[in-house]
Amino acid sequence: MNPPKAILTDIEGTTTPIAFVHRVLFPYAKANMAGFLAAYSDDEAVAAILAEVEAQYPGRPALETLLGWMDEDAKITPLKALQGLIWREGYRNGALQAQVHPDAAQSLRAWHEAGLNLFVYSSGSVEAQQLLFSYSDQGDLSLLFGGFFDTRIGGKREADSYRHIIANTGMQPQSMLFLSDIEEELDAALDAGLRTCQLVRAGDNGGPPTLRHPHAPDFIAVAHLFGLPHP
């Protein structure tokens, strides 16, 4: 089989350590949420998010709902959008710097230089994805990607979401390789016709290797498995 022409990558547990998301990003958003909402309550984007939250739970304080969703690690679009706005402020004022595995950064650069089309699909908002790759400890990686997708296109465990991504990118399903650490996401992508590879990174507390999908410990191994350029 020919090497993939496009890569669709997850972030958490794939390009970026799970610990960075759960021990740095989430606590930062939670600690700063009340102050951010108070400071930016008149901002149009913030007001729209709050209206969406309040429409789901009328009469309940939006902050209470948002913090509850955070405690549940809910993949809900208005929460993810607000987190993205809070993180934007943190990245821009120097309080945050994203962590990206060196092997991921090196491979993504090599694949981009070789002409592969690179895309991101994460439960975090598109803005949060762009910020993470812009303010990474491996330099600005954001311009390597031709597109970013979040839960507005659908849930990551639903095959139709990957079909929508294929339609949006104009790629053929079998020409796109999806990289993730989560078996259910890989199952959905495979059901939509994409090629798949599970990242099983040592010490990252991701899922165990699956039987249905090829797996690799890092992006260098992915490159060898699928005949892709490697650093």
From Swiss-Prot:
A Pfam short name: Hydrolase
Keywords of this entry: Amino-acid biosynthesis, Hydrolase, Magnesium, Metal-binding, Methionine biosynthesis
Database matches in InterPro entries: Enolase-ppase_E1 (IPR023943), HAD-like_sf (IPR036412), HAD-SF_hydro_IA (IPR006439), HAD_sf (IPR023214)
HAMAP family given in the database record: Salvage_MtnC
Gene Ontology annotations of biological process type: L-methionine salvage from methylthioadenosine
Cofactor(s) this protein cannot do without: Mg(2+)
Cofactor binding mode and count: Binds 1 Mg(2+) ion per subunit.
A single MF term (Gene Ontology): 2,3-diketo-5-methylthiopentyl-1-phosphate enolase activity
Biological role: Bifunctional enzyme that catalyzes the enolization of 2,3-diketo-5-methylthiopentyl-1-phosphate (DK-MTP-1-P) into the intermediate 2-hydroxy-3-keto-5-methylthiopentenyl-1-phosphate (HK-MTPenyl-1-P), which is then dephosphorylated to form the acireductone 1,2-dihydroxy-3-keto-5-methylthiopentene (DHK-MTPene).
Cited NCBIfam families: enolase-ppase (TIGR01691), HAD-SF-IA-v1 (TIGR01549)
Catalyzed reaction equations: 5-methylsulfanyl-2,3-dioxopentyl phosphate + H2O = 1,2-dihydroxy-5-(methylsulfanyl)pent-1-en-3-one + phosphate
SUPFAM superfamilies referenced in this protein's UniProt entry, alphabetically: HAD-like (SSF56784)
Top EC class for this record: hydrolase
Protein name: Enolase-phosphatase E1
Complex formation: Monomer.
The family this protein is said to belong to: Belongs to the HAD-like hydrolase superfamily. MasA/MtnC family.
EC number in record: 3.1.3.77
Pathway: Amino-acid biosynthesis; L-methionine biosynthesis via salvage pathway; L-methionine from S-methyl-5-thio-alpha-D-ribose 1-phosphate: step 3/6; Amino-acid biosynthesis; L-methionine biosynthesis via salvage pathway; L-methionine from S-methyl-5-thio-alpha-D-ribose 1-phosphate: step 4/6
